[in-house]
């Protein structure tokens, strides 16, 4: 990870200044920003041509970064979630009052993944908090796995690209309900 130290530091600086970045994840390039910066989230919505009603996934390097954004759930259900993390699995939790409405959208839940991707995890660690993780595509388009295509599609609309290898998964992560285990997206 030493090869990426400067790039990660630059990405963190960009995030703290309210920028929108692209970064590698378990499956595809993700677009993200500080989830607590409303202006940055508004910019991301514009870039993706996405409705605020849909909500966003948050990634974190560890559970404690996102736990305050969730309401407590049954310990057995939480154990089932923890069995899949860190890893390419996104779970929806009942959202707490701490979860910004521009992250949850029209939902009463918040979607969270504790990432196993080394660069995404390090990015969250250095940022000291969760990040929005939305597939690098415009609404309805295919997710991007190639940095050259990422540059062609988004050009100067994003503030920083953190280049790096993608994870071994070739599709966006599945989403499941943390309480019921129901699959919401495969």
From Swiss-Prot:
<dbReference type="GO" id="GO:0006450">
    <property type="term" value="P:regulation of translational fidelity"/>
</dbReference>
<dbReference type="GO" id="GO:0000049">
    <property type="term" value="F:tRNA binding"/>
</dbReference>
<keyword id="KW-0808">Transferase</keyword>
<dbReference type="GO" id="GO:0005737">
    <property type="term" value="C:cytoplasm"/>
</dbReference>
<dbReference type="InterPro" id="IPR023535">
    <property type="entry name" value="TC-AMP_synthase"/>
</dbReference>
<dbReference type="InterPro" id="IPR017945">
    <property type="entry name" value="DHBP_synth_RibB-like_a/b_dom"/>
</dbReference>
<dbReference type="GO" id="GO:0003725">
    <property type="term" value="F:double-stranded RNA binding"/>
</dbReference>
<dbReference type="InterPro" id="IPR050156">
    <property type="entry name" value="TC-AMP_synthase_SUA5"/>
</dbReference>
<dbReference type="GO" id="GO:0061710">
    <property type="term" value="F:L-threonylcarbamoyladenylate synthase"/>
</dbReference>
<dbReference type="GO" id="GO:0005524">
    <property type="term" value="F:ATP binding"/>
</dbReference>
<keyword id="KW-0547">Nucleotide-binding</keyword>
<comment type="similarity">
    <text>Belongs to the SUA5 family. TsaC subfamily.</text>
</comment>
<keyword id="KW-0067">ATP-binding</keyword>
<dbReference type="Pfam" id="PF01300">
    <property type="entry name" value="Sua5_yciO_yrdC"/>
</dbReference>
<dbReference type="GO" id="GO:0002949">
    <property type="term" value="P:tRNA threonylcarbamoyladenosine modification"/>
</dbReference>
<keyword id="KW-0963">Cytoplasm</keyword>
<keyword id="KW-0548">Nucleotidyltransferase</keyword>
<keyword id="KW-0819">tRNA processing</keyword>
<comment type="function">
    <text>Required for the formation of a threonylcarbamoyl group on adenosine at position 37 (t(6)A37) in tRNAs that read codons beginning with adenine. Catalyzes the conversion of L-threonine, HCO(3)(-)/CO(2) and ATP to give threonylcarbamoyl-AMP (TC-AMP) as the acyladenylate intermediate, with the release of diphosphate.</text>
</comment>
<feature type="domain" description="YrdC-like">
    <location>
        <begin position="5"/>
        <end position="186"/>
    </location>
</feature>
<dbReference type="InterPro" id="IPR006070">
    <property type="entry name" value="Sua5-like_dom"/>
</dbReference>
<protein>
    <recommendedName>
        <fullName>Threonylcarbamoyl-AMP synthase</fullName>
        <ecNumber>2.7.7.87</ecNumber>
    </recommendedName>
</protein>
């Amino acid at each position: 990870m030493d090869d990426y130290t400067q790039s990660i530091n630059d990405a963190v600086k960009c995030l703290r200044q309210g920028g929108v970045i692209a970064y590698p994840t378990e499956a595809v390039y993700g677009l993200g920003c500080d989830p607590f910066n409303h202006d940055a989230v508004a910019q991301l919505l514009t870039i993706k041509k996405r409705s605020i009603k849909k909500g966003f996934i948050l990634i974190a390097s560890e559970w404690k970064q996102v736990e305050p954004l969730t309401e407590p759930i049954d310990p057995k259900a939480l154990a089932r979630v923890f069995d899949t993390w860190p890893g390419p699995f996104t779970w929806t939790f009942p959202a707490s009052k701490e979860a910004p409405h521009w992250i949850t959208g029209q939902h009463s839940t918040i979607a969270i993944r504790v990432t196993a991707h080394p660069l995404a995890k390090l990015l969250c660690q250095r940022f000291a908090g969760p990040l929005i993780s939305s597939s690098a595509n415009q609404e309805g388009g295919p997710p991007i796995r190639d940095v050259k295509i990422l540059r062609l599609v988004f050009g100067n609309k994003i503030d920083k690209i953190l280049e790096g290898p993608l994870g071994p998964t070739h599709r966006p992560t599945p989403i499941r309900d943390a309480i019921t285990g129901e699959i919401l997206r495969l």
